[in-house]
Curated annotation (Swiss-Prot):
It comes from Oryza sativa subsp. japonica (Rice). Residues 1-26 form the signal peptide. The active site is at D83, H431, D483, E492. Gene3D superfamilies: 1.50.10.10. Keywords: Carbohydrate metabolism, Cell wall biogenesis/degradation, Cellulose degradation, Glycosidase, Hydrolase, Polysaccharide degradation, Secreted, Signal. This is Endoglucanase 16. Residues 513-538 are annotated as: Disordered. Residues 516-530 have a biased composition (Low complexity).
Length: 538
């Protein structure tokens, strides 16, 4: 439905309706349970030697010789999804979003008793990035080979597939993967600034080196590493990652040079030009635009930056309004399609990544709008301006974010939770090698490449292991979902699907416990950003 200002009565009615819907949703879902389970998922995806405190007991050590042939230690990190390749670009994006999630809602994560687990999830990734960044101008961007890996169905503990490692360097650049890794380490450095200052400093050092590498030696990483093209091709190029990394480094350091970079290159790199309707591991423009708009609305800039930051904000609000279906001009592509049940729909394969990322961006932006509406910034007030007229206030933007979260948790036509392990109905046949085969600790009998397909992949029954906290690819544009291991487009889960939901679940847990329903749609702000002060508004 397109929004029009037709009077105060209608506006008040819309806000009251949004508040009522949000209050009803709060009563339906246990967000604290969702938070706990979402963090378990990252333990299921761990590669390397598992720690003594490992809670996902059906996993064991794996990938213990990664990097050995190349003479580097690349043990650790995360498997991206249901296979066993370690892809650097989506892994780094996962860590960036986990970190941003904590920077916005870390106080709520701490209040729920899950801060230590969230920090562990981030550090498991950043410890690996430190290993992978072996020289100032060298980054190991992939371990394993997607082609050989996808021909096998094995537990990671039994892997017989290639563990070839691939790097980017001065001769074979990869500005996108280096830029995203810089962003991840910069964002994580803020997260650890108070709790582990030495580690925070180390992360920031790597982030600055990686950004310099990405900017000086420019090129797409899939041109340097051909093996990644069929799996995580950098379709959007590397300009968005350079802007993204610069803004995260500005947030981490406060240095004007990084903001100057994002402003000076805004037009050439597409930051103020692209009107985007998706945000993902590949396409970062919406995130860039929202980070830049935050600076404007908080007044954290010099006067010479204002004009460019205003244009960033215009594009940020195009994305926000597109997710709400409120851009009244620009044609059919100006808004994101919705399923009959209300799910944002971008494309068939792993659509849930766009849903969860949109929910987080809308929620964060609603906080920024609320701050601007309170007069704390200089960005023109607390209403997002949509293309073709009309707008959306902070409460409405937040209600739209919450609607997507609740869809994931089961408020949908099928009544199915797409967060595995949550609710009465959730996917039982997740496309996930380790989850679909008897645990290694229960049966150490070797399972070969083809044997896994013969004995486990084609089984009709549920997986023997529940990969708790995974968010699967989800339903199609008509809300249809087929729970079948072979249906990888819908039943495979990825780390970057769950990452933005960690903070969202924590924040919604707090709001659902508050007595006044009006607070659930006006602001979600905490004081945990940017320095992880970890106080909670109650």
């Amino acid at each position: 439905m397109r929004w029009r200002r037709v009077g105060d009565v209608v506006a008040v009615a819309l806000l009251l309706g949004a508040a009522a819907a949000a209050a009803a949703a709060a009563a339906r879902h246990d967000y604290e349970e969702a938070l706990r389970k979402s963090l378990l998922y990252f333990e299921a995806q761990r590669s390397g030697r598992l720690p003594h405190g490992q809670r996902v007991a059906w996993r064991d050590h794996s990938g213990l010789t990664d990097g050995l042939e190349q003479g580097v230690d690349l043990v650790g990190g995360y498997y991206d999804a249901g296979d066993h390749v370690k892809f650097g670009l989506p892994m780094a994006f996962t860590v960036t979003m986990l970190s941003w999630s904590l920077l916005e809602y870390g106080a709520d994560v701490a209040a729920a008793g899950e801060l230590a687990h969230a920090l562990d999830a981030i550090k498991w990734g950043t410890d690996y990035f430190i290993k992978a960044h072996t020289k100032p101008h060298e980054l190991w961007a992939e371990v394993g080979d997607g082609d050989t890996d996808h021909y096998c169905w094995q537990r990671p503990e039994d892997m017989t597939t290639s563990r070839q490692a691939y790097k980017v360097d001065r001769r074979r650049p990869g500005s996108d993967v280096a830029g995203e890794t810089a962003a991840a380490m910069a964002a994580a450095s803020i997260v650890f600034r108070q709790s582990n200052p030495h580690y925070s400093h180390l992360l920031l050092h790597h982030a600055q080196q990686l950004f310099e590498f990405a900017d000086t030696y420019r090129g797409k990483y899939d041109s340097s590493i051909a093996e990644v093209k069929s799996y995580y091709a950098s379709v959007s190029g590397y300009h968005d990652e350079l802007l993204w990394a610069a803004l995260w480094l500005h947030r981490a350091t406060g240095r004007a040079a990084y903001l100057d970079y994002a402003v000076d290159n805004a037009d050439e790199f597409g930051g103020t030009g692209w009107a985007i309707t998706e945000f993902s591991w590949d396409v970062k423009y919406a995130g860039v635009q929202i980070l830049a708009a935050r600076l404007l609305m908080r007044g954290e800039h010099e006067e010479r930056h204002r004009g460019t930051l205003e244009r960033y904000r215009e594009k940020a609000e195009h994305y926000v309004c597109a997710c709400m279906g409120r851009n009244a001009a620009g044609g059919a592509d100006a808004n994101v399609e919705r399923s009959p049940g209300g799910m944002l729909y971008v494309r068939q394969w792993n659509n849930m990544q766009y849903v969860t990322n949109a929910a987080f961006l809308l929620s964060a932006y609603s906080d920024y709008l609320a701050g601007a509406g309170d007069g704390d910034g200089d960005g023109g007030g607390g209403v997002a301006t949509c293309v073709g007229g009309g707008g959306a206030g902070a409460g409405e933007v937040f209600a739209a974010a919450r609607e997507q979260v609740d869809y994931v948790l089961g408020s949908n036509p099928r009544g199915m939770s797409y967060l595995v392990g949550y609710g009465e109905r959730f996917p039982a046949r997740v496309h996930h090698r380790a989850a679909s085969i008897v645990p290694y600790k229960d049966s150490k009998e070797f399972i070969g490449c083809a044997q896994g397909f013969d004995d486990w992949f084609g089984r009709r029954g549920a997986n023997p292991n529940v990969v708790v906290g995974a968010i699967v690819g989800g339903p199609d544009r008509r809300d249809r979902f087929r729970d079948d291991r072979e249906n990888y487009m819908q039943t495979e889960a990825c780390t970057y699907n769950t990452a933005p939901m960690v903070g969202m679940f924590a924040m919604l847990n707090r709001l659902s416990r508050q007595e006044s329903p009006s607070t659930t749609t006006t602001t979600t702000a905490t004081t945990s950003s940017p320095e992880m002060g970890l106080s909670v508004n109650r």
